Swiss-Prot record:
Disulfide bonds: none annotated. Residues 7-96 form the GST N-terminal domain. Pfam families: GST_C_2, GST_N. Coiled coil: none annotated. Belongs to the GST superfamily. This is Glutathione S-transferase domain-containing protein DDB_G0280881. GO terms for cellular component: cytoplasm. Residues 102-228 form the GST C-terminal domain. PROSITE patterns: GST_CTER, GST_NTER. It comes from Dictyostelium discoideum. One of its GO terms (molecular function) is glutathione transferase activity.
Length: 260
């Protein structure tokens, strides 16, 4: 049985990571444009709260983000970040062109949203994991995900050379999907992603950075770095105290790609 809080429209399960920032962004946008209300519930993965019986009822995949829509007669659970984006965009008829009247634009936005979840997110996440959180150096994994992260950045920069926004001419869930990961470039030069190498990505970051919701999430990301814990994350992957407290293969400020 899902606990209902009738005081808010949505319950948002989060933990302040890239995929959850996507949902934070769209909820802030909808709060500004449609007056929606929501309650954030933090799931501490370092304490394995995502494996609790209560949370598994929300998401059997044991990951955040997830939402519970409480606006109808019965609550509706949605998990997986891009699924949530599509659900909310369709529900409020915003950030996603209508399929019946604009099938090409609709397809472009959904395609680039799914592209992020299938390509950009996994490449960035795995490269960052093996660079910083892995208790041991794994050269093959670093090389593999270095190449993939480099590839997706180049592809996205090319896309943004012909379109101001990722999904087309208007801000959409395609932008929100990638922003969850790429907003970090405003604070730390991960992947050695500079304006010189990827001018169109940084032009896009400046463009979306003018939005109030993005400004708020940027502030949260900045604050999040103050509470960053390598040991806490590593505890998810090993019980060995020496490995948990070992020096990272590289420092957080030096997670960079090696360019050809």
């Amino acid at each position: 049985m899902i606990e209902i809080n009738n005081k808010v429209d949505f319950i948002f399960y989060t933990n302040g990571t890239p995929n959850t920032y996507k949902i934070k962004l769209i909820l802030l946008e909808l709060e500004n444009s449609h007056g929606i209300t929501y309650e954030s519930k933090t799931i501490d993965i370092t304490k394995k709260e995502n494996y609790s019986d209560e949370f598994v009822k929300i998401n059997p995949n044991k990951k955040v983000p997830a939402i519970v829509d409480q606006t109808g007669e019965k609550p509706i659970i949605v998990f997986e970040s891009v699924s949530i984006l599509i659900y909310l965009a369709q529900k409020y008829n915003t950030f996603l062109p209508d399929f019946k009247t604009n099938p090409k634009e609709n397809s472009d936005v959904i395609t680039w949203s799914v592209w992020q979840a299938a390509n950009l997110g996994p490449a960035f996440g795995q490269f960052f994991h093996f660079s910083y959180f892995s208790p041991t150096v794994q050269e093959y994994s670093l090389h593999r995900f270095n190449n993939e992260a480099q590839r997706v950045l180049r592809l996205l920069d090319d896309r943004l050379s012909v379109s101001p926004y990722i999904g087309g001419n208007e801000f959409s869930i395609a932008d929100i999907a990638s922003a969850g990961w790429l907003l970090y470039l405003n604070f730390v030069p991960f992947y050695n992603a500079t304006k010189e190498r990827f001018p169109n990505i940084f032009k896009w970051l400046d463009l979306i950075g003018q939005r109030d919701a993005v400004k708020q999430v940027n502030q949260q990301i900045s604050e999040g770095f103050k509470n960053f814990s390598t040991a806490g994350i590593r505890a998810l992957f090993t019980n060995d105290p020496e490995l948990i407290n070992a020096k990272a293969p590289v420092g957080i400020e030096n997670v960079v790609l090696k360019y050809d």
